[in-house]
Design a protein with these regions (language model features):
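Acidic, Ser/Thr/Gly/Pro-rich intrinsically disordered interaction regions
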Residues: 1-32, 50-227
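Extended, well-ordered alpha-helical segments in internal regulatory regions
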Residues: 40-52
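Glycine-rich, low-complexity intrinsically disordered segments
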Residues: 29, 33-36, 43
């Protein structure tokens, strides 16, 4: 498994999500592929570590398998790397968006599917704790039937959306939102009152996983330098 190919796939899937946003069917399709690549990257880091530490794991490499073989061989440096990775991975996911991605990945791994995707209105310029308004339209096979119907429903929901978001914006001395500064996008919800925009989440998360790859390789190099 080639990590660099997987990170390139993440970038491609992120662009495809942006292209098809907010269509639930296509966003779900490419977001699923994005998450599969993320899981492959994490396993790929331990595949590289398996080679560099000389553990000779022949089956599919995961962190658990890596730990089992390192314990069996009493390879303290390999165990140090795994412990470092766990701490580093946890730290990288402390911020809200990476934390949400981690929860979505866990949900998908446990349920073999993503949480339900919904279409919501948001302001084009994002501010912390902004209000999002769900819009419901007819779908065919989970696909948007017509952009015209979507636009009609956005227009219908706009007055109440602007009233609520601008009350919040005014309270926080933030720029006012007008009807020309709203857009629809696909969101997922894992927890009450915590809707996460998928396109934006992927844009934020790709640099996080890139950093995790680079720093993991540096740590492996540091721990195997004497070998």
């Amino acid at each position: 498994m080639n990590i660099e190919e997987e990170i390139t796939r993440c970038e491609i899937y992120s662009k495809q999500i942006k292209q098809y946003d907010p269509d639930p069917f296509y966003v779900d399709y490419f977001f699923t592929k994005y998450i599969n690549s993320i899981n492959n990257i994490v396993n790929g880091i331990f595949e590289e570590a398996n080679i560099d530490f000389g553990l000779f794991i022949t089956e599919k490499v995961t962190q658990r398998k890596f730990n089992e073989k390192a314990n069996l061989k009493k390879d303290e440096d390999a165990l140090k790397f795994s412990k470092w990775f766990s701490k580093k991975n946890k730290k990288e996911h402390e911020n809200p968006y990476p934390n949400s991605m981690n929860k979505i990945c866990l949900f998908k791994n446990e349920n073999e599917a993503l949480p339900k995707i919904k279409i919501m209105i948001r302001a084009t310029e994002r501010y912390k704790n902004d209000f999002y308004q769900e819009i419901k339209i007819d779908l065919k096979n989970r696909k948007i039937i017509s952009k015209e119907q979507l636009d009609i429903e956005i227009k219908r929901q706009t007055p109440i959306f602007l009233e609520i978001i601008n009350a919040k914006r005014n309270q926080n001395d933030e720029p006012k939102v007008t009807n020309k500064k709203i857009i629809s996008s696909a969101f997922v919800n894992l927890e009450k009152n915590n809707d996460v925009e998928i396109m934006y989440l992927c844009q934020i998360y790709t640099p996080v996983i890139r950093r995790l790859i680079d720093e993991s390789r540096e740590k492996i190099k540091e721990l195997t330098n004497w070998k």
